[in-house]
Amino acid sequence: MQTDVFENKVKEIPETEGIKYAGSKLKILPYIMRIVSDLEINTVLDGFSGSTRVSQTFAKLGYDVISNDVAFWSETFAKAYLLNTENPAKYQEIIDHLNGLKGYEGWFSQHYGGVENNGVKYPFQLKNTMKLDAIRDEIDRMNLTEIEKSVALASLILAMDSVDSTLGHYVSYLAEWSPRSHKDLHLRLPKLFVNNGKNKVVRDDIFNTVKEHKVDFAYFDPPYGSNNEKMPPSRVRYDSYYHIWKSVILNDKPKVFGKANRREDSRDEYSASVFEEFRKDENGSFIAMQAIRKLIKETNARYILLSYSSGGRATREELFDILNESGKLIRAEEINYKKNVMGGMRWTNEWINSDNKNFEYLFMIEKS
């Protein structure tokens, strides 16, 4: 359990797990749940679920959750954690079988497995990609149910994440092997829990998802683009950071490019999100902010909680206008990661330390 002290009260947040993830909401989960605790809600949409920690938390607390993301690996994690209705121990035999396999050099070893002192940077040591090759091919050969396969794949990705030699993403790799990369790949049973059977997992564009579902509460944490005006058009997109997990899920052995051996479909023209768009439209408004405006307007929920990073594109005035167009802004909070404190936003001032990457903002809207 995560503990969180606020106004002399201690809140317990259910334990969750996930990979190292640039968009992880692990640190702000207590703040999210504190805000939500005052609401009378049953159904929740986690619109950009990513590593699924937010979805896991709501599900463990008894809410009916719709977990949505466009990433295949996020869908797999969501299925493993949110759709399981069995005793988790039933999956241990699968994990044990996969751990017992002998590794061999296959597609993953060819592209992502490195050895000591050869002068080339790789995300994993060869001994572990060999095990990955064997395990991933075996998963496809086994007669697994959808949930069993999701559990096996989630376990595999968690294991790979624990022996990588990266900073947490896969667009560049460390010059020297990380200490954890020397460990042997070993799968363990994910920390599953028994669900109520009412959760739903969706892999779709968020605009399609909000049109098809009505919920009491929606949480949105889009992959915002940088507010750096000097950011070049060729910058790496969010989806590209985790291209390797897509390859693990699909096992499709795609064509790759560049020094990091990224998937061809992780290029900007294939994988870019409108929420990451750093350009302005013909009216001088950031395209990403217009996407937020559209999302809030089209979401069928009584309450919407929007996360926004201090590194994003919005100006104070623009975001304030967007939030109030489709409802009433009833709460605005600023979180200082370094100080681990939350305080009300001062709308009469400029963004507080707006160039500080350690700030996160939470905006609660009640739709009209």
Predicted regions and their residues:
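S-adenosyl-L-methionine
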Residues: M1-F48, R53-K60, N84
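Conserved Class I SAM-dependent methyltransferase catalytic core
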Residues: R267-G327
